[in-house]
């Protein structure tokens, strides 16, 4: 039935602006593992370093620290990159102004990671950053929780605070993102096996294996260094990450190198290796020679984006596959 009367007699504004807490609560529980949120934070750091790899003033280092707080874990990701020039854009949902590589091109990763670690009303996170302009002014900038959007009296805009000095940042420029993750959520990094140990040390080991696997190509083929610092009981232990790569059965591995191809999103260079791998018993998750850790492994510029027994019917990628 059509409405024949097209002349309204009145109108009113619909007030449907989201609140920051409502947004975080809505997007905060979509990951199966806290490791996915950790990788979102690492993606931003690596993206910045790769996009500015020709800058001799940068430190090509990403340090991830995990501190045992008992009922929670403090996660901190520090890089020696350029710093974040526009924190407003970085904290705006779907804003792509700061996109530098495919690792941070969608404008959701930082917010999604923070919300996934802690979307509670008393969320705790902070972003400290220092650009070359900040360093010249002998200052750093900081934004702290909660996440707000300035949409109501109860949801006031976030503020950037300027402080003198370097704010504990270990490099001339760079960014430190710190977020509290409840221990129950951090324990999701544990493999889904009854025998898998769940004490803090082993949880950090699972995260290390995840990082070594996800960023194997980055660690093997770029000058970026990644470290994990494990903090528990007042002691610190530093782990320098090495790429986690398969051990091939002799004579089975084949290569297809430097194959140009356009899958519909632009020209790519495809590198492919395939064959039989030997199980690595020391691994908790990857390259164990079982069904779960076998199948297809897909990487973009060295970063794993898919693995396991999957099939692809359509794939559009805008960048180089390594």
Give the location of each predicted region:
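Glycine-rich, histidine-containing beta strand-loop boundary motifs that form or position
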Residues: 41, 79, 128-131
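Single conserved hydrophobic/aromatic residue that forms the stacking wall/gate
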Residues: 314, 319-322
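Glycine-rich/acidic phosphate-handling loop/turn and adjacent ATP-lid/helix
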Residues: 78-100
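GHKL/Bergerat-fold ATPase module in large chromosome/replication-associated machines
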Residues: 223-315
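Short helix/loop capping segments that flank catalytic or ligand/cofactor-binding pockets
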Residues: 50, 85-87, 181, 186-189, ...
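Short, highly conserved beta-strand within the GHKL-type HATPase_c fold
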Residues: 71-76
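GHKL-type ATPase core
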Residues: 100-232
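Bergerat-fold GHKL ATPase/HATPase_c domain
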Residues: 1-61, 66, 86-91
